[in-house]
């Protein structure tokens, strides 16, 4: 009797517990699946958002203009693009695959900033495209002009350069000596993040033509040129009364500057980089990398953009055939 009575009761209890455990496992599995699905969706949304926020940087390189290891437009741009692409920062670099203004204008679609390294003045790549490029600038796209690219013709080109980056190299006002300024007093600005005092011998243009009262302009690299930078007779790029007076009065000369446009957008002018080997100076390179990021409205790490050391072999890569 005891076996007959307790046997069925025990079986029912065991079956009930098994069902409960099965339901618990199903519930747990459903919860885990729900959270996993949610996390995957969040990750996908995060990746999509990150892709949407990637800063696209376009590089324009001019045709060859000087001898080997001077005015290496494409090679210089490739150094910058490669360093930025490897930085781990949220950027995407696109170097125009041919010298001159882009044949495929869609490369500018969604661009955050444009880097221009080319022959200046009458040979500037932007001269035939001022109106189209102006539309980009008015939409808030940034711009970086390197070395001779900072030199514009008087008239409409110069006026546009003032609007886009606050200053330009102007014939019969600016000069182009080779010298070794010492940059030991750096301003507090995102472009100087991680930059240490340095000196590089290069062709540093100075006595730029700036907007009135330098409104919106922040000097980034400045120094007082020595008298020997003005030993040449007066000429378009060698000297003039105004620059001689400025140096004689002890006014430090700006060779790199940042510009906040009143209507939105940022510009940066950098007069060095005649000598291709200058890119081997880490601080020289970091200033320009930081400036590219700044004009693209990107946050710059407190130690600046991660900056590679360019060795003797790497500096000879991507050179133009000359």
Language-model features: locations:
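Extracellular ligand-binding/catalytic regions of CAZymes and related secreted enzymes
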Residues: 48-55, 79-82, 87, 229, ...
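Boundary at the C-terminal end of the N-terminal hydrophobic targeting segment
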Residues: 41-46
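Bacterial N-terminal signal peptides
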Residues: 26-39
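Catalytic beta-strand/loop cores that center a nucleophilic Ser/Cys/Thr
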Residues: 170-263
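Short, low-complexity, charge-dense intrinsically disordered segments
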Residues: 5-17, 21-24
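Extracytoplasmic/secreted proteins, especially bacterial periplasmic and envelope-associated proteins
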Residues: 75, 79, 128, 132, ...
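A glycine-rich, often tryptophan-bearing local segment used as a flexible ligand/cofactor-contacting loop or short
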Residues: 123-197
